[in-house]
Each structure stands twice: as C-alpha cells, then as structure tokens.
C-alpha cells in the first residue's frame, strides 16, 4: 500500500493526467536499457539494442515502455491495494522472466527523472516527493511475489 496524503495524491493524479504514456514510457524504458545495460538481457528479442540511439528509436522498446507506463497509471487507481493489483505481474516477472526486483526501483527512479525533464517547473519538490513514494510503492508491489 502506498500512503499518499490527499495533497500528494492530488499532485500525482494532476500531473499524470498530462502524461503521454507512449512518450514518457518509451523514454523511461529506453533510458533504463541505456543507463543500466545489464537490463537489456530481458529484451534481447526486441532487436537492435546496440547503441543508445538504436534503443531509443526501437519500436518494440517504445511499445513496451507505453505498456509499462500504462501499468503505472493503473496503479494510481489502486493505491490501497497495489500488491493485489500487481500480484500476477509480480509472479510473471519473478517465476517466468526472472527479473531482478531491484530493476523495478531503477525504473521508478528513471521515471521520476523523465517526468522532471518533461514537466520542468510543474515538477515541484512536493510533486517529486509524492512521485518517489508512488514509484517506491509500485516497485514494492512488483517485487512482492519474489521468494
């Protein structure tokens, strides 16, 4: 469960209403793959991941980034039960994909950077603090089924 105050929740939801999941998701996932290249092993079937430019322009990275960000958006609708909401996704990443749960934290922190880049002055200290809590809750929920 993420414990956001009413004010924090309003900040997160307000900014999220402006988010283009395709653009922000694509950039966030692309940056994860560039900055932390060991994460590429989960996406080898996506084709060319040989350079930062290739990763950022890769249509499969872009599509998956949008899908990932859509899940974050879904999380906003279930702040009181993120673990239940993402139980199946957690099991998939744990049991089938064998993703290191630390990667969820990395992606969340990159998402915060990308949001700050795109929303500049709107991304105040208070908004960042609220988003850090939210992405930490998402990372915790996605890591919940790990043994």
UniProtKB/Swiss-Prot annotation:
Pfam families: Globin. The keyword Nucleotide-binding does not apply. Heme b binds at residues 64, 93. GO terms for cellular component: blood microparticle; haptoglobin-hemoglobin complex; hemoglobin complex. Gene3D superfamilies: Globins. Red blood cells. CDD domains: Hb-beta-like (cd08925). Residues 3-147 form the Globin domain. It comes from the Eukaryota. One of its GO terms (molecular function) is oxygen carrier activity. Keywords: Heme, Iron, Metal-binding, Oxygen transport, Transport. GO terms for biological process: hydrogen peroxide catabolic process. InterPro entries: Globin (IPR000971), Globin-like_sf (IPR009050), Globin/Proto (IPR012292), Hemoglobin_b (IPR002337), Hemoglobin_oxygen_transport (IPR050056). Heterotetramer of two delta chains and two alpha chains. Belongs to the globin family. This is Hemoglobin subunit deltaH. The lineage of its organism: Eukaryota, Metazoa, Chordata, Craniata, Vertebrata. The gene is HBD.
């Amino acid at each position: 469960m993420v414990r956001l105050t009413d004010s924090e929740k309003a900040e997160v939801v307000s900014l999220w209403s402006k988010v283009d999941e395709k653009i922000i998701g694509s950039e966030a996932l692309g940056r994860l793959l560039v900055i932390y290249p060991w994460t590429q092993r989960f996406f080898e079937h996506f084709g060319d991941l040989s350079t930062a430019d290739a990763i950022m322009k890769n249509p499969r990275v872009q599509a998956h980034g949008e899908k990932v960000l859509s899940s974050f958006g879904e999380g906003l609708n279930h702040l009181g039960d993120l673990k239940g909401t993402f139980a199946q996704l957690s099991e998939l990443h744990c049991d089938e994909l064998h993703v290191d749960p630390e990667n969820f934290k990395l992606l969340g922190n990159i998402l915060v950077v990308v949001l700050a880049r795109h929303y500049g002055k709107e991304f105040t200290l208070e908004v960042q603090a609220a988003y850090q809590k939210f992405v930490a809750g998402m990372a915790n929920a996605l890591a919940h089924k790990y043994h």
